[in-house]
Amino acid sequence: MRLSVRFPLAFSVATALGVCLLPVAHAQSQSSSSSSSGVSYSSASQTTGTGTYIVIDPLAKVRYDNRYDVSLGMAYDHMKAGPTLLSGSNLGGLDLEGSYWLTKRWGAEGTARYYLGTSGAAPNPYAIQGPFVSQTFFGAGPEWLGPHNKHGDLIAHAMFGGVYGKFQQDLRGQPASVVDFYNDQFAFAGIIGGHMDLNRSEHWTFRVTPDAILTRYSINYGNHATSNDVNFALSVGIEYKFTKKKR
């Protein structure tokens, strides 16, 4: 009789323990499966997220084989408005230039420049001080391509033509002799200098242009003197190269 009672009791205890442990085992199985799938997902995510960087060189297509180019810059010019004036004048304006390249090294260049500013004046009874003066240049000549690579270049040029000097526009109707100015006139002009270019792309260039400017003005009063002046000019701007037409 004791055997029959103990057996059902032991069986009942074993069954109860099994029922209690079953959820724990199931939870551990799910946790292990979730952890395994998480590792796989993270690995896949890291694999697909890795990209390749492509380096683009904006100067890769820079070639010195274009037939035409044009440039425009803000310009500065120092000059003297009269043959005996002690003070010079600093003028500002625009510098427009264009080139037609004949060979790899040689081309023809033209320029049009306008400068405007005020100038010192000789003592006068009309209290004229700091009148406006202007110069308009036009010229053409050869240019030569010097050292160059994809980053930049040096170009030399020598252009000759004329200048229209307007010196009497702000004298209140008085003659130029009152302030020792030149008369309004057309005169010979020469521009000798060059360009310093910094390429920014196949088409666009940052350009600095220093020049020596020669002028030959005269006066029609007094001794009718003619003055040969050499002054400094500088412009800073941009150049555009038309690359479809090759040399």
Spans of features found by a protein language model:
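Bacterial N-terminal signal peptides
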Residues: 10-20
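Sec/Tat signal peptide C-region and signal peptidase I cleavage site
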Residues: 21-27
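Short glycine/proline- and aromatic-enriched beta-strand/turn motifs that initiate or cap beta-hairpins
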Residues: 27-100, 239-243
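Transmembrane beta-barrel outer-membrane domains
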Residues: 63-67, 87-91, 101, 129-137, ...
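Gram-negative (and chloroplast) outer-membrane scaffold detector with strong preference
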Residues: 97-177, 187-189, 193, 200, ...
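Outer-membrane beta-barrel "beta-signal"
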Residues: 230-247
